[in-house]
């Protein structure tokens, strides 16, 4: 398992540091995640960060239910400090205001042996992997715009997914119960696979993959990249650029800008128009999340679209004075946009 850390330097340009890959033989995944988070923060405590975690469990048995790993991600994202003990993880609360963290987590991949021509049926039944169901994490699935096969090696093969549709690699939250969060939150480019007339699926096809730098440049400069790990790296890059351009934004605001800058592709909207009923449309949201984020939309208002960002806190419900076990309406914030003057 590797742990990626994404940040921006003091000049405002985003950069990525890849820590050496390491695979612990023992220990809880939640403990490993907490320790990895602590190590980089100790090295440079004042540096702003986005944590990109493109590693998940290999099964989908949790189906949205919390686990010790997803709970640790939720706690770390909320700004809590964790420490390992003989009884597991314990919270370290010193009374200071928590410093929230942005965790960008891959949704997880469909098993290589389970890729099917009947896409996206397999993705819709393969649930997002642990810990990507964490409420406070930005969970990233994959879509693809890559649908042109030119390599002579793949003559007679066609792309599995249509351009603008769900990547065949990406898991979804379609089978989650309604009580659990919508996951993935967003989707980024994750590549495609190829299929032939016999119903066989193959990968990787260079035409349908992304090109990235190899983690050992002395061995080779570039390597093919695909699936939700690639999509997560792209999401982390976008979040780091937003944080670098707007250093005063809260972590949750950066996350919100990524999500609010997303929109469904024309192909995704085709499925939406063909969906009959509210439940069918809800299933599509749990497949695509809120769509594909666009950096320009996050950084700048498009045309005459006004974007108002309010960073504040409130308590929407308060205990009743006469009945403390019951709740009443609490805070509400109003924003005066000014009256139009003739």
Q: Can you say where each PLM-predicted feature lies in the sequence?
A:
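Subtilisin-like serine protease catalytic core
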Residues: 1-29, 46-51, 62, 97-100, ...
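Active-site alpha-helical elements of protease catalytic centers
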Residues: 1-11, 31, 223-243
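A Trp-anchored, charged/polar loop motif used as the substrate-binding/catalytic surface
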Residues: 2, 24-43, 122-123, 160-173, ...
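Short, flexible loop/turn elements at secondary-structure junctions
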Residues: 2-4, 20-23, 55-57, 107-111, ...
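Substrate-binding/access-modulating region of protease and related hydrolase catalytic domains
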Residues: 15-134, 147, 218-226, 230-232
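Catalytic-core environment of secreted peptidases
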Residues: 142-160, 164-232
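Contiguous mid-protein beta-loop-alpha structural module that forms a pocket-lining wall or clamp
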Residues: 231-234, 240-243, 251, 255, ...
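Secreted peptidase-domain scaffold signal
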Residues: 279-342
């Amino acid at each position: 398992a590797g742990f990626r850390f994404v940040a921006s330097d003091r000049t405002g340009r985003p950069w990525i540091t890849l820590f050496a890959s390491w695979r612990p033989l023992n220990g809880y995944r939640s403990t490993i995640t907490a320790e990895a988070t602590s190590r980089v923060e100790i090295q440079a405590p004042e540096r702003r960060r986005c944590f990109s975690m493109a590693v998940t469990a290999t099964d989908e048995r949790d189906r949205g239910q919390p686990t010790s790993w997803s709970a640790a991600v939720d706690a770390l994202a909320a700004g809590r400090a964790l420490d390992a003990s003989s009884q597991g993880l314990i919270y370290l609360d010193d009374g200071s205001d928590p410093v929230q963290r942005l965790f960008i987590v891959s949704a997880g991949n469909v098993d290589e042996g389970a890729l099917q021509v009947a896409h996206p049926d397999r993705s819709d039944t393969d649930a997002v992997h642990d810990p990507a169901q964490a409420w406070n994490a930005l969970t990233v699935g994959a879509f693809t715009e890559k649908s042109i096969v030119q390599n002579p090696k793949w003559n007679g093969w066609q792309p599995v997914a249509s351009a603008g549709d769900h990547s065949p690699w990406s898991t979804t939250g379609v089978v989650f119960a309604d009580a659990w969060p919508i996951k993935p939150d967003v989707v980024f480019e994750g590549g495609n696979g190829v299929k032939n007339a016999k119903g066989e699926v193959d990968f990787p096809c260079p035409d349908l993959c992304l090109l990235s730098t190899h983690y050992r440049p002395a061995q080779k400069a570039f390597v093919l990249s695909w699936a939700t790990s690639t999509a997560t790296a792209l999401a982390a890059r976008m979040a780091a650029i937003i944080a670098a351009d707007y250093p005063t934004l809260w972590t949750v605001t950066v996350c919100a800008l990524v999500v609010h800058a997303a929109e469904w592709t024309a192909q995704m909207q085709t499925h939406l128009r063909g969906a009959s009923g509210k439940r069918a449309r809800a299933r599509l949201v749990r497949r695509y999340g809120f769509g594909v984020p666009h950096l320009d939309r996050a950084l700048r208002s498009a045309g005459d679209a006004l974007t108002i960002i309010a960073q504040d806190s409130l308590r929407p419900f308060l205990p009743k004075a006469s009945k403390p076990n019951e709740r009443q309406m609490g805070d509400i914030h109003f924003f005066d946009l000014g009256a139009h003057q003739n």
